[in-house]
């Protein structure tokens, strides 16, 4: 029993040590069972995925959260006051709501790809995450899933944004900006803007959950750690 608690404490220290910029108190990760450390980390990160997606993939998950709320594209934002004076304030509000609803609808579709990346995480990946920065796991997921997630989100978001008349106006304006070299072609639609902002919000929330786990791993996932290390003899 004492050995179980000792090994558990080593894992907790390893998970938290990144906040100190490296291995705390000279901890050698080789003192841990690689398989157990990796399994424990994956369980904690699986919980983080569920929490991040669960917070965003619901009504008002984006719209009522200032950290991730998708505001008007910069080109429209600059003209917002004038447009409201011209009587299109309702359309602007509808556009903001629609963009955020599109993001809320897309985020739940990320779970499959994120959990696929989690399954494919190697022991070396796990060690790098344990001793990395406070968002090392989030960066791993971002590198592994950003491109396929963007492809998955885009059509879901497009089905919502294409229903907004002001979105069509934005797209027309953006296309002109491309010809002038102001915008890149891939950024010239409302769909691409919202897709990028949705991904930004998702990874921001995942980083928050990761920091919470690193700060208080036992408080965040005590039952899973007991389960992982309870069988160690």
Model-derived features: positions:
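Alpha-helical transmembrane segments and their juxtamembrane interface "caps"
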Residues: 56, 105, 109, 139, ...
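C-terminal segment of classical bacterial N-terminal signal peptides
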Residues: 15-23
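Bacterial N-terminal signal peptides that target proteins for export
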Residues: 1-10, 17
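Mid-length scaffold segments of soluble, non-membrane domains
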Residues: 89-160
């Amino acid at each position: 029993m004492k050995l179980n608690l000792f090994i558990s404490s080593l894992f907790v220290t390893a998970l938290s040590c990144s906040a100190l910029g490296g291995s705390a108190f000279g901890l050698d990760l080789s003192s841990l069972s690689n398989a157990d450390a990796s399994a424990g980390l994956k369980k904690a990160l699986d919980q983080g995925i569920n929490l991040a997606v669960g917070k965003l993939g619901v009504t008002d998950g984006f719209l009522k959260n200032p950290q991730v709320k998708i505001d008007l594209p910069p080109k429209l934002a600059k003209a917002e006051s004038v447009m409201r004076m011209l009587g299109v304030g309702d359309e602007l509000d509808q556009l903001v709501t629609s963009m955020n609803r599109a993001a809320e609808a897309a985020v739940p579709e990320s779970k499959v790809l994120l959990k696929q990346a989690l399954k494919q995480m190697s022991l070396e990946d796990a060690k790098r995450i344990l001793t990395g920065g406070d968002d090392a796991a989030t960066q791993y997921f971002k590198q592994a899933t950003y491109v396929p997630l963007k492809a998955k989100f885009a059509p879901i978001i497009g089905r919502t944004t294409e229903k907004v008349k002001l979105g069509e106006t934005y797209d027309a304006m953006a296309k002109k900006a491309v010809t002038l070299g102001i915008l890149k072609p891939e950024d010239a639609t409302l769909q691409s803007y919202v897709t990028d902002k949705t991904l930004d919000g998702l990874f921001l929330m995942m980083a928050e959950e990761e920091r919470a786990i690193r700060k208080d791993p036992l408080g965040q996932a005590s039952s899973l750690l007991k389960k992982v290390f309870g069988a160690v003899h």
